[in-house]
Amino acid sequence: MRFIPLQTEQQVSCWAAQHIINRINDFKPTAERPFVLGLPTGGTPLKTYQELIRLYQAGKVSFKHVVTFNMDEYVALPEEHPESYHSFMYNNFFNHIDILPENINILNGNTDDHNAECHRYEEKIKSYGKIHLFMGGVGVDGHIAFNEPASSLSSRTRIKTLTQDTLIANSRFFNNDVTQVPKYALTIGVGTLLDAEEVMILATGHQKALAVQAAVEGSINHLWTVSALQMHRHFLLVCDEAAQQELKVKTVKYFTELEGAVAGTDYQGK
């Protein structure tokens, strides 16, 4: 695990965006050999997308040879709905960069056969070999994508029933009306995420502190989905100060000193 303890949400966003750009540029993608990037939605990555757009406009990166796979999508919510994850991604990121439309992959929550759609998505990922970097956020209960507590830690892309906590948390995007939040979603599985070459999770705010504690100091536990990433060879957790508040002082000190020791190296994980 590599843990990046920062101070502010803006620092988290800028650090994450620069890491993505470094990975893309170091990879030197081409049409025949694209860089494959996994992406989330929600409030946490929004500023990272804004920073990526700024750096793209400054000529620091091109997304022309980047293929993206999103984590999840609501079931039975029209793609044109302002709160669909299709709308979120296009409005907040894709419409502002040079990514090719055919390189964008988002689960179709309006298909008649959800199982077939999930299988198709898994096969599409496999067709590229692997996802090189998967960025994600984490829920207050430790869920990743829509892999709610007690999800199988070897799960693949599938349909999931959303918990009441998730419905309440997401109601802020639906005029605080929990009855308007879709009850089901298609989501990549924990196993799908673990297959990625590198996973970078962003956590900001005190409400994420218990999830961060579970990810860093806790045992691997299906009730805290994020804890499964302890098994990943290249798991990167980037947090602001508020999200670190449940960690032991010596834990933060250890990782802070470790980052200082490896600054400027090609260190990828421990």
Swiss-Prot record:
Similarity comment: family membership: Belongs to the glucosamine/galactosamine-6-phosphate isomerase family. NagB subfamily.
NCBIfam families xref list: nagB
Gene3D superfamilies registered for this protein in UniProt: 3.40.50.1360
Lineage of producing organism: Bacteria, Pseudomonadati, Pseudomonadota, Gammaproteobacteria, Pasteurellales
Annotated site, Part of the allosteric site, chain positions: 151, 158, 160-161, 254
Subunit comment: Homohexamer.
Catalytic activity: alpha-D-glucosamine 6-phosphate + H2O = beta-D-fructose 6-phosphate + NH4(+)
Entry GO terms, CC: cytoplasm
Activity regulation details: Allosterically activated by N-acetylglucosamine 6-phosphate (GlcNAc6P).
InterPro entries in UniProt: Glc/Gal-6P_isomerase, Glucosamine6P_isomerase, Glucosamine6P_isomerase_CS, NagB/RpiA_transferase-like
A molecular function GO annotation: glucosamine-6-phosphate deaminase activity
Disulfide bonds: none
A single BP term in Gene Ontology: glucosamine catabolic process
Top-level taxon in the UniProt lineage: Bacteria
Alphabetized UniProt keyword annotations: Allosteric enzyme, Carbohydrate metabolism, Hydrolase
Pfam families according to UniProt: Glucosamine_iso
Stated role: Catalyzes the reversible isomerization-deamination of glucosamine 6-phosphate (GlcN6P) to form fructose 6-phosphate (Fru6P) and ammonium ion.
EC number: 3.5.99.6
Pathways involved: Amino-sugar metabolism; N-acetylneuraminate degradation; D-fructose 6-phosphate from N-acetylneuraminate: step 5/5
Name of the molecule in the record: Glucosamine-6-phosphate deaminase
Segments crossing the lipid bilayer: none
Residues the record marks as active site: 72, 141, 143, 148
